[in-house]
């Protein structure tokens, strides 16, 4: 089982990177023990909530194996996990932004997938012999990406920055889902459909990165980390069709542990 040993070794290294910078990592004296734990607020959608990685704890699909929970645990941070499945940028504005307090030390934001309609597009494209309809659905999402998306994302990230001016703000992107293969009898994604969806994810990440730069935030891009671990790969970090259906095509436990945690966690270095 060498591949699993390598995975475990990678996980240990990733968590060591995060844990090495924990505010209390050197706590050996009463003075250190009395220090206030640093705070971390995680905003966003189902990817940030951890849906698809282990059993969800609530209706928002929050999981103890999502990268916010893992980073907070290893880094000994006080976590406010406000992320919720189905959230759009408007939802983060209206329902999650208040979770960010002025004294927050770290804030991550992962949102945008629902704004471009990834869930309905995936359901549409999963139907057999449906390339034209799939392409139309993807085109609709890309039209928004090329239209109001940049302004809306910049406004949201700017609002988060205004809530906690001293916090380290990290915008988080999305992984490549497909590798050109279709390995399930339950769905049928053609090579053309997979290419369209992957291309839209790449464009989404570009837009998120640009919006992050505009407000002085960091951008954590998981694309390279997930390379070789798309659905239907030898060791996938992304679910295929699963129950509940809403957890399909989300990072699994390995994706959160070995993909997202080191990619996002490195920005917690002081």
Segments predicted by a language model, with ranges:
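A structural motif corresponding to the C-terminal end of an alpha-helix
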Residues: 73-77, 152-168, 203-220
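Short amphipathic alpha-helices and their capping/turn segments at secondary-structure boundaries
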Residues: 24-39, 92-109, 153-168, 264-268
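Catalytic His-Asp segment of secreted/periplasmic serine-dependent ester chemistry enzymes
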Residues: 175-270
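Structural recognition of the beta-strand scaffold that forms the well-ordered cores
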Residues: 39-44, 48-50, 78-83, 105-110, ...
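Serine-esterase "nucleophile elbow" of acetyl-processing enzymes
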Residues: 30-83, 97-98
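Acidic/histidine-rich helix-loop elements
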Residues: 51-63, 122-130, 248
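Oxyanion-hole/transition-state-stabilizing segment in secreted/luminal serine hydrolases
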Residues: 91-145
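Secretory targeting and sorting signals
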Residues: 1-29
């Amino acid at each position: 089982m060498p591949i699993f040993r390598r995975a475990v070794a990678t996980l240990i290294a990733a968590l060591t990177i995060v844990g090495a910078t924990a505010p209390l990592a050197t706590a050996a004296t009463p003075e250190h023990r009395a220090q206030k734990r640093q705070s971390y607020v995680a905003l966003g959608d189902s990817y940030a909530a951890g849906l698809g990685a282990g059993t969800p704890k609530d209706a928002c699909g929050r999981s103890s194996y999502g990268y916010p929970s893992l980073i907070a645990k290893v880094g000994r941070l006080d976590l406010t996990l406000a992320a919720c499945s189905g959230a759009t940028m408007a939802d983060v504005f209206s329902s999650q932004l208040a979770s960010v307090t002025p004294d927050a030390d770290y804030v991550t934001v992962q949102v945008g997938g629902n704004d471009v309609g990834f869930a309905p597009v995936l359901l549409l494209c999963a139907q057999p012999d449906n390339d034209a309809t799939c392409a139309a659905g993807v085109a609709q999402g890309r039209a928004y990406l090329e239209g109001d998306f940049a302004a809306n994302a910049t406004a949201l990230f700017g609002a988060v920055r205004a809530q906690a001016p001293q916090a380290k703000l990290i915008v988080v992107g999305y992984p490549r889902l497909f590798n050109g293969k279709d390995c399930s009898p339950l769905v049928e994604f053609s090579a053309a459909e997979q290419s369209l969806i992957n291309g839209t994810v790449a464009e989404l990440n570009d837009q998120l990165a640009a919006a992050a730069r505009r407000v002085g935030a960091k951008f954590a891009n998981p694309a390279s980390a997930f390379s070789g671990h798309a659905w239907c790969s030898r060791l996938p970090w992304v679910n295929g069709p699963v129950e509940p259906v809403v957890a399909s095509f989300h990072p699994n436990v390995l994706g959160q542990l070995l993909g997202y945690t080191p990619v996002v966690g490195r920005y917690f270095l002081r």
